[in-house]
Amino acid sequence: QENLILFGEKGQFVLRGNDLLTPKTVSVTPITNYDNDTGTTPLELGSYIYFPFNRGSFSGLREFTINANTDNYDSVEVTSHVPRYIPSDIIDIAGSTSENMICLVSASNTREMFVYKYYWEGNQKILSSWSKFTFPFNIRGMEFVDSDLYVVAVKSSKTELLKIPMEEKLVDDNTTFNTYLDMRTNNTYTTGNDGTITLPFTPEAG
């Protein structure tokens, strides 16, 4: 559909693309009336749009759907089974259709990232789960590129760009397993040298 979906604090609207668009004919139509946390931009993922909302001191997430055949719009909450799990005031949201995953960060604790994982079978979502990652740094931004999540991290006044592979059943090259080690880097060792390895970052004590 060539429609523009607009999100307000108290509702959702549509600007239809098949109408003649002039200053005199433009028409914005309300379609649903769900609260929206305007602290972050809604996430377009596949044929759905995800947007957070505040529930007191906690946050919820809605899955906005469009029926192209009937031009009907609806929204389903995907946090109804965990209403007191995610803190309020979401400031960033990122998602991947490759991994069926959405990540959220709240302003109340930018060291935590909440992860929504789901599985579709046809048009039916048969599995979904929420989990939480806790990091030793503050998250300032994040974005998926294919199956990798890139995170802008701040720790001890230093800003770093980190990559977190989110691919399922990921294994290391030339192995049948994956090594779970933060900040790891590849290095080629030559027999006979002093064994010094130069890291692309400055290690911290502890």
Give residue spans per PLM region.
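Surface-exposed extracellular loop regions of Gram-negative outer-membrane beta-barrel proteins
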Residues: 5-20
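Short, charged/polar micro-motifs that form catalytic or ligand-binding hotspots
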Residues: 2-3, 32
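Beta-sheet repeat architectures centered on beta-propellers
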Residues: 2, 55-206
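Catalytic or ion-translocation cores adjacent to nucleophile or general acid/base/metal-coordination motifs
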Residues: 19-63
